[in-house]
C-alpha cells in the first residue's frame, strides 16, 4: 500500500525538481524513502554529482503526470469527484477523507470535515469520530492515518544540513563582526588604508621571524646582492603611509602590494624575493658594511679589484648607506661605508704581511652625469675617458689625492658631496641625477696594486624619464637607463666568466672596466628600498633589478641563451655613419648587444632612442673638440694677419707676397670653417633625430629599471 503512494515514480526515471534558488530542472530518482514519504534525486552540475531529498508533495506539484490513480470507488450517493479535487486529495495522500466527508459531521465537532485541519486539532477530531461511530466505515490503516491526521511536513536530511550550515554561518559572521569591531578599536580608523594595515598585520602575525644578526656567518661571494630597508621617514609618517615591506628572515624580502578587484574589494598580493642578505630597518650601517663591503677590502690587498654599488630609488637610503648618518641636513661621514672601508684599509696596512709592501693609499672622487665625467675634487672639471693601445681605460685629468688617515678621506668625501649634481624628479624633490664614484687606490712604487670603487648610483626612478619634453631630462634618463642596463650585464658577465663584457655601452661601465675583468674581481650590490606604500612600484622595480642581477649568476644553464638580432628601419643616423666614421664603433656594438640581451625590457623604439642619444653624444664631443681646435687656429690666424697688416704699412712692401699670403690664410679659413659648419649641420640633424626617436618610445614594460 505504501509503494502505491509514490504513484508512477520509479527509480531511474527523471523528474522535474525546484532548487532553493528557484531554478527548475530535471533530476534522476535514485531511491524511494517510504518512512518519510520522500524521494532522493541526483543530477550533474559543473561536472559534479549533486543530490537532494524531496517530499512527494513537491514532486507531484511539478510532475502531475506521476500522481497515483484513485483505487477506491467513490460512494454511489456522491457524484464522481472532479479531477482537481481528486488531485488535491491525492497530493496529501489521504484518500479516506472523501468517505469521511460523506457523513455530515456532528455540530459540536465541525473541524472534522476540514481537509486543512491544524495538527493541534486532530486528536479531538479522532476522538469525536470514534464517539459518533464513523470509524466502522474505515479500514484499520486508514483509521491509523486518520487518528494521527495529516502530519506536519517532515524536514529532509538535506534541509537539516542546510539549516546547520546556515546556523554556523551566522555564528561565524557574528564572530567576525566582533573581531572587526575589536580591530577598529586598536587601529586608527581615520587612516584611509586601515583595512590594508589590518591585512598586513594579520599576515605578519603568521610568519616565523628569523632576522639577520651579527652572529651569523659571512659567506664568500664573488657577486653579493643584498637588500636594505629603511624605516618610515617623518614625511611618510605624517602622510599616514603604510609599511608594506616585511623581512622575515636573513635572506627574504616580502612586498605586500595593495590591489583592488573590479568590485572595488581591496586585497594584498604578497611577493617574495630572495637575496644573499636582507637587512631590516633596525640594521645600522656597521652591520650592513660587515656583510657587504668589508669582505671586499682584503681583495684589493691581494692585487684585486672590488666594487660596491648602492642602488635604488632616490630617498631610499643610498647616500645614507654610502656616506653616513644624517642629522637634519648634516651628514656624519664617519658612519658611512666610504669611511668604514677607509678605516679597514688603514688597519690592514699595519698588518705585517702588508706593511712590508710599502703601499700608498690614494683617493679619487668623480661623478658621471649625462654620459660626461666630472672631477668632484677639482671644481667639477670635465674629464675625457679614453682607451689606450692596451685597451686600458684612462680618465684623462682625474686627480688622485694621497690620503694618510681616515680623516683625510672624510675631508675629500665632504668636498665631493657638496659638488654633486642633484635635481627634482617625478618621484622626489631632491634626486641624485648623477652616479658618484669614490675610489680607494693602492699603489706600490707608483704601480697599481688594487682598487676599491664605491658607487652611489643615481636614483633609478630617473630612468623612466626618457620621454620627457625637455631634452636635458631625456638625456639624463637615457644615460641612467643605459648605464643601469650595462651595469647589470657586466655583473652577469662577471658571474658567468663570459669572454666579452659590454662595458663600452655606457660611461659608467667603461670607467669601471677593470673591476669587471679578471679572476680577482668581486662585486657587491646593496639595493636600498623605501617601505612606504606610495613607493611600492619603485620598490618592486628595485627588487626585480637586483633579483635579475643575482638570478642569472646562480643559473649557469641559462648562459647559452641566444637572442635574435633586432632589425630596425634605416634612419638618418645611418646616413651620417659614412661622414662621421662611427657606424661600427665598439660603443655602438656593445649598445646593440646590450639591447639584444634585454629585449623583454628594451623595445625597438627605445633601442633606436638610445642609439640616437649615443650618436648625438659622440657628435657633440667631436663638434666641441673641432670648435676648440678652430678657436686655437684662429689665434694663429690673427697673428699671421696682424703681421700682414704691419707689412702693408711699409712704404715699399711686396704686394704680390701680401696677396698670396692673405689668399692662403683665407683658403685655409674657408676649408676649416666649412668643415666645421657641415659637422654642426649634421649635429643639428642628430638632435632632431633624437627628438623624433623620443616621441616614438613605447617600452614593453612601462617602469623604471
From Swiss-Prot:
Keywords: Acetylation, ATP-binding, Cell cycle, Cell division, Coiled coil, Cytoplasm, Cytoskeleton, Developmental protein, Differentiation, Lysosome, Microtubule, Mitosis, Motor protein, Neurogenesis, Nucleotide-binding, Phosphoprotein
CDD domains: KISc_KIF2_like
Phosphoserine modified-residue sites: 75, 134, 139
Protein name stated in the entry: Kinesin-like protein KIF2A
Modified residues (N6-acetyllysine): 101
Residue positions binding ATP: 312-319
GO MF annotation, one: ATP binding
Disruption phenotype: Mice show overextension of collateral branches of developing axons and defects in neuronal migration in the brain. They die within 24 hours of birth.
Biased composition (Polar residues): 122-139
Example of a GO biological process term: cell differentiation
Localization: Cytoplasm; Cytoplasm, Cytoskeleton; Cytoplasm, Cytoskeleton, Microtubule organizing center, Centrosome; Cytoplasm, Cytoskeleton, Spindle pole
Family of this protein: Belongs to the TRAFAC class myosin-kinesin ATPase superfamily. Kinesin family. MCAK/KIF2 subfamily.
Phosphothreonine: residues carrying this PTM: 96
Gene: Kif2a
Gene3D superfamilies reported in the protein's UniProt record: Kinesin motor domain (3.40.850.10)
Keyword Plastid: no
One Pfam family, short name: Kinesin
Oligomer and partners: Interacts with AURKA and PLK1. Interacts with PSRC1. Interacts with MCRS1; the interaction enhances recruitment of KIF2A to the minus ends of spindle microtubules which promotes chromosome alignment.
Natural source organism: Mus musculus
Amino acid at each position: 500500500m505504501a509503494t502505491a503512494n509514490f504513484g508512477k515514480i520509479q527509480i531511474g526515471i527523471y523528474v522535474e525538481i525546484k532548487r532553493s534558488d528557484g531554478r527548475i530542472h530535471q533530476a534522476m530518482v535514485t531511491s524511494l524513502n517510504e518512512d518519510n514519504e520522500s524521494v532522493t534525486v541526483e543530477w550533474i552540475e559543473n561536472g559534479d554529482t549533486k543530490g537532494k531529498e524531496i517530499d512527494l508533495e513537491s514532486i507531484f506539484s511539478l510532475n502531475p503526470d506521476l500522481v497515483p490513480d484513485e483505487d477506491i470507488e467513490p460512494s454511489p450517493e456522491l457524484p464522481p469527484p472532479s479531477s482537481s479535487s481528486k488531485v488535491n486529495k491525492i497530493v496529501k495522500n489521504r484518500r479516506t477523507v472523501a468517505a469521511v466527508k460523506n457523513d455530515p459531521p456532528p455540530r459540536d465537532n465541525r473541524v472534522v470535515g476540514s481537509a486543512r485541519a491544524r495538527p493541534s486539532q486532530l486528536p479531538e477530531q479522532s476522538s469525536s469520530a470514534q464517539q459518533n461511530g464513523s470509524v466502522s466505515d474505515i479500514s484499520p490503516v486508514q483509521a491509523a492515518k486518520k487518528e494521527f491526521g495529516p502530519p506536519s511536513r517532515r524536514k529532509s536530511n538535506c534541509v537539516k544540513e542546510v539549516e546547520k550550515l546556515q546556523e554556523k554561518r551566522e555564528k561565524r559572521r557574528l564572530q567576525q563582526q566582533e573581531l572587526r569591531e575589536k580591530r577598529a578599536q586598536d587601529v586608527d580608523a581615520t587612516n584611509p588604508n586601515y583595512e590594508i594595515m589590518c591585512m598586513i598585520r594579520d599576515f605578519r602575525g603568521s610568519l616565523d621571524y628569523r632576522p639577520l644578526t651579527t652572529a651569523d656567518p659571512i659567506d664568500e661571494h664573488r657577486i653579493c646582492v643584498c637588500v636594505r630597508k629603511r624605516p618610515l621617514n617623518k614625511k611618510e609618517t605624517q602622510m599616514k603611509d603604510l609599511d608594506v615591506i616585511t623581512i622575515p628572515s636573513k635572506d627574504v624580502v616580502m612586498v605586500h602590494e595593495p590591489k583592488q578587484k573590479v568590485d572595488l574589494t581591496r586585497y594584498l598580493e604578497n611577493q617574495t624575493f630572495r637575496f644573499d642578505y636582507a637587512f631590516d630597518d633596525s640594521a645600522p650601517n656597521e652591520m650592513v658594511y660587515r656583510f657587504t663591503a668589508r669582505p671586499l677590502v682584503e681583495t684589493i690587498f691581494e692585487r684585486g679589484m672590488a666594487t660596491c654599488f648602492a642602488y635604488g630609488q632616490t630617498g631610499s637610503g643610498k647616500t645614507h648607506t654610502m656616506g653616513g648618518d644624517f642629522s637634519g641636513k648634516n651628514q656624519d661621514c664617519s658612519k658611512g661605508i666610504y669611511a668604514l672601508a677607509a678605516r679597514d684599509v688603514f688597519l690592514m696596512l699595519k698588518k705585517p704581511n702588508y706593511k712590508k709592501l710599502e703601499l700608498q693609499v690614494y683617493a679619487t672622487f668623480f661623478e658621471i652625469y649625462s654620459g660626461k665625467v666630472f672631477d668632484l675634487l677639482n671644481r667639477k672639471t670635465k674629464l675625457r675617458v679614453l682607451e689606450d693601445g692596451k685597451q686600458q681605460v684612462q680618465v684623462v685629468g682625474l686627480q688622485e689625492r694621497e690620503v694618510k688617515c681616515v680623516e683625510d678621506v672624510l675631508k675629500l668625501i665632504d668636498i665631493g658631496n657638496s659638488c654633486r649634481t642633484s635635481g627634482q624628479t617625478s618621484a622626489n624633490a631632491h634626486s641624485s641625477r648623477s652616479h658618484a664614484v669614490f675610489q680607494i687606490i693602492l699603489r706600490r712604487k707608483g704601480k697599481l696594486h688594487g682598487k676599491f670603487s664605491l658607487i652611489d648610483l643615481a636614483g633609478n626612478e630617473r630612468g623612466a624619464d626618457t620621454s620627457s619634453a625637455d631634452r636635458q631630462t631625456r638625456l639624463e634618463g637615457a644615460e641612467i637607463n643605459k648605464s643601469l642596463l650595462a651595469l647589470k650585464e657586466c655583473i652577469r658577465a662577471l658571474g658567468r666568466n663570459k669572454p666579452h663584457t659590454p662595458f663600452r655601452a655606457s660611461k659608467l661601465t667603461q670607467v669601471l672596466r677593470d673591476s669587471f675583468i679578471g679572476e680577482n674581481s668581486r662585486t657587491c650590490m646593496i639595493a636600498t628600498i623605501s617601505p612606504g606604500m606610495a613607493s611600492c612600484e619603485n620598490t618592486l622595480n628595485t627588487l626585480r633589478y637586483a633579483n635579475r642581477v643575482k638570478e642569472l649568476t646562480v643559473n649557469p644553464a641559462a648562459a647559452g641563451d641566444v637572442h635574435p638580432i633586432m632589425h630596425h628601419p634605416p634612419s638618418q643616423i645611418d646616413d651620417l655613419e659614412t661622414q662621421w666614421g662611427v657606424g661600427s664603433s665598439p660603443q655602438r656594438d656593445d649598445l646593440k648587444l646590450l639591447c639584444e640581451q634585454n629585449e623583454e625590457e628594451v623595445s625597438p623604439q627605445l633601442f633606436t632612442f638610445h642609439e640616437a642619444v649615443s650618436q648625438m653624444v659622440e657628435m657633440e664631443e667631436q663638434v666641441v673638440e673641432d670648435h676648440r681646435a678652430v678657436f686655437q687656429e684662429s689665434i694663429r690666424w690673427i697673428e699671421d694677419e696682424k703681421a700682414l697688416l704691419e707689412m702693408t704699412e711699409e712704404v715699399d712692401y711686396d704686394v704680390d707676397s701680401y696677396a698670396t699670403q692673405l689668399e692662403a690664410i683665407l683658403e685655409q679659413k674657408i676649408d676649416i670653417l666649412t668643415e666645421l659648419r657641415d659637422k654642426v649641420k649634421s649635429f643639428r640633424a642628430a638632435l632632431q633625430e633624437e627628438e623624433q626617436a623620443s616621441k616614438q618610445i613605447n617600452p614593453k614594460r612601462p617602469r623604471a629599471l
